[in-house]
Regions:
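Mature extracytoplasmic or organellar-lumen-exposed domains after removal of signal/transit peptides
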Residues: 21-426
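C-terminal motif of bacterial Sec signal peptides marking the signal peptidase cleavage site
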Residues: 9-12
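Bacterial signal peptide processing site
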Residues: 14-17
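Sec-dependent signal peptide recognition
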Residues: 1-4
Length: 426
């Protein structure tokens, strides 16, 4: 049985229109993202299978773009990447993601949810610093990797997914998409429009639906965060782990992993990483509890202002996760740059960390609730440029680049209220 705590929210329930008093109604807030249907007894009202498929497609696309840099790699084309990015059910494709040695409830995308892809959900807004939408950038990057694959000297090495300026395109694609699809859809579409949703009858008046429009749209926002239903039962170390055995679990004991409820994706794992590497932060708890509390208020037809408050907490938490991750990769980039010209120089690592820094910075633009303003982002992109710097320690260019990156950290620290300690050690 799931433990639950009760929170009190003010809900007006008087029959007389002149009755000015509201009654306090206790709304149960479970510790897991689990809610029963108001309409069909014994059924769950939680539904975000489409988001699960998009999390898998996004993760599998990274596996695919990384693959061309591994020993024994096969050359891939832009069509191979688009088969995931613009996925079609007719392809009958199975996910590349595993749960270690544990069987899966479903491994084909269309068995989890039909008609889902990444391309159809990507923001059309121009990317700050690039002047074109993320979809156009992603297509250019697919083509560059495909062209690199034709060069036998590059295929099977990091050069296969790296452009001529040292940009790790596998990382750029992955990080830009988590912003332009997942973060954008969660905050810019679903949370942004949640207060206008209907919350008293079955979705689309369909008697088979177990949820209202507001319940479903909130679930979809949560689905893009990527957390397992029992997210808070995972430690930060598990969420930050490298293997599925750490960040997934057979919670219901059926001997299988259900990607819809028993696996942690993307942003939810980044939150654990930043909590693990920081002090005095609990982004995992802040975000998850806001999603659960907001959903409980919606299910209990509670105060819409309380829904709005939980929406703000969830959106702010996700922004902090992304911003803290930018800080983390600024620190990694600075560490890599300090080794240039020495025996420990590793440009592959520098290219990787720079692209992660840059890609997550792009991701920050997509929330209407953001504290990191477009002006801040323009400054950050101006600092970072469009490729890594290979200036060696001792040069004026190196000193200026280091000073600029430290300024970038300060911008994020002020905007998000990060402690100096965390900005230094993330």
């Amino acid at each position: 049985l799931l433990m639950a705590c009760s929170l009190l929210f003010m809900v007006g329930c008087g029959d007389d229109e002149d009755d000015e008093e509201d009654a306090e109604v206790a709304i149960e807030v479970p510790t897991a993202y689990t809610f029963d249907s108001r309409f069909i007894e014994g059924e769950s009202s939680v539904s975000y299978s489409g988001q699960t498929v998009r999390n898998l497609l996004w993760q599998d696309l990274k596996i695919k773009t990384d693959s061309v840099g591994k020993s024994g790699a096969q050359a891939l084309t832009a069509n191979d990447f688009n088969a995931l990015y613009d996925h079609k059910d007719a392809s009958n494709m199975k996910t590349l993601t595993t749960a270690g040695g544990t069987p899966l409830v479903a491994d084909a995308y269309s068995k989890i949810s039909t008609g889902k892809n990444l391309k159809g959900k990507i923001s059309a807004d121009p990317v700050i610093g690039y002047g074109k939408p993320a979809d156009a950038l992603v297509q250019e990057w697919f083509q560059t990797i495909a062209e690199n694959c034709k060069d036998s000297s590059k295929l099977g090495t990091a050069a296969a997914y790296t452009d001529e300026n040292g940009v790790d395109l596998s990382q750029m694609i992955n990080k830009v998409l988590v912003g332009a699809v997942h973060y954008y859809q969660s905050t810019g579409v679903y949370l942004n429009g949640i207060l206008e949703q209907e919350n008293s009858k079955q979705y689309k008046d369909d008697p088979a639906k177990t949820y209202t429009a507001m319940e479903h749209k909130w679930d979809e926002a949560f689905g893009y965060f990527g957390a397992a239903r029992d997210y808070l039962s995972y430690s930060d170390a598990q969420l930050a782990g490298k293997t599925p055995a750490e960040f997934s679990r057979d919670s219901n004991g059926d001997g299988k992993i259900d990607f819809k409820s028993e696996y942690n994706f993307g942003l939810s794992r980044n939150a654990g990483k930043r909590d693990k590497g920081g002090s005095g932060t609990d982004l995992t708890k802040d975000i998850f509890q806001a999603f659960v509390a907001g959903r409980a208020i919606i299910a209990g037809e509670g105060d819409i202002n309380q829904v709005a408050a939980q929406r703000e907490i969830a959106a702010a938490g996700m922004e902090k996760v992304i911003a803290a991750t930018v800080v983390h990769y600024i620190n990694d980039t600075l560490a890599d740059m300090s080794k240039l010209g020495t025996a420990d120089e590793n440009k592959k690592d520098l290219n990787k960390h720079w692209a992660e820094m840059k890609g997550f910075t792009v991701a920050l633009q997509y929330s209407p609730f953001k504290k990191v303003t477009d002006g801040n982002l323009a400054e950050l992109h101006g600092i970072m440029g469009k490729s890594p710097s290979y200036a060696k320690p001792g040069s004026a260019e190196y000193d200026q680049t280091v000073a600029n990156y430290k300024r970038a950290k300060q911008v994020l620290q002020v905007a998000c209220g990060f402690s100096a300690e965390n900005v230094a050690k993330w």
